[in-house]
């Protein structure tokens, strides 16, 4: 298991992106939309497959009737680091062997990307959103970092 990405949330994508770009001095690349959660993102590639994600609710998305991941429905204030996500293999086994409720494993797709991720029904990760989410990338899918310019 290793850290896959850090998520920086904002009330809108422009704010979150600007925060990262002005803080680090690097331009982010366009990510995409997560239709299932009504969110969208931009990405910044780092070393060794690690990347940063600016994420927010997508105002043009369809209304959903369940909580969004990363507790974005309750996000307010300035952009900030809100979550970290660990890349793992055998995500179902990890969920069974983790002593806290990390949520259910959901299959997610976006463009050419396919992955499984732990998602809690209330959208809040354990320990008030401080515990990591777990992600397992589909072996037949590319990893986002492979298409990102590295900084």
Task: Label each residue range with its predicted role.
Residues 1-6:
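Extreme N-terminal starter segment of soluble prokaryotic enzymes
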Residues 10, 61-65, 140:
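Short, functional N-terminal and low-complexity linear motifs
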Residues 10-32, 43-45, 52, 68-151:
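Vicinal oxygen chelate
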Residues 12, 48, 58, 88-90, ...:
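Non-catalytic surface loops within mature trypsin-like serine protease
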Residues 15-71:
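Glycine/small-residue-rich interface belts in oligomeric ring/scaffold proteins
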Residues 38, 48, 78, 128-129:
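A short, structural micro-pattern
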């Amino acid at each position: 298991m290793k850290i896959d990405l850090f998520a920086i949330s904002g009330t809108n994508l422009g704010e979150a992106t600007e925060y990262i770009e002005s803080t680090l001095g690097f331009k982010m690349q366009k990510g995409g939309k997560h239709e299932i959660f009504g969110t969208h993102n931009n990405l910044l590639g780092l070393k060794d497959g690690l990347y940063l994600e600016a994420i927010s609710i997508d105002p043009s998305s369809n209304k959903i009737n369940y909580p969004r991941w990363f507790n974005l429905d309750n996000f307010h204030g300035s952009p900030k680091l809100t979550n970290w996500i660990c890349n793992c293999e055998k995500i179902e086994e990890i969920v069974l062997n983790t002593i806290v409720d990390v949520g259910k494993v959901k299959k997610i797709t976006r463009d050419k990307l396919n992955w499984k991720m732990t998602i809690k029904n209330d959208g809040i990760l354990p320990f008030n959103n401080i515990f990591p989410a777990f992600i397992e990338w589909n072996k037949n899918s590319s990893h986002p970092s492979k298409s990102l310019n590295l900084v």
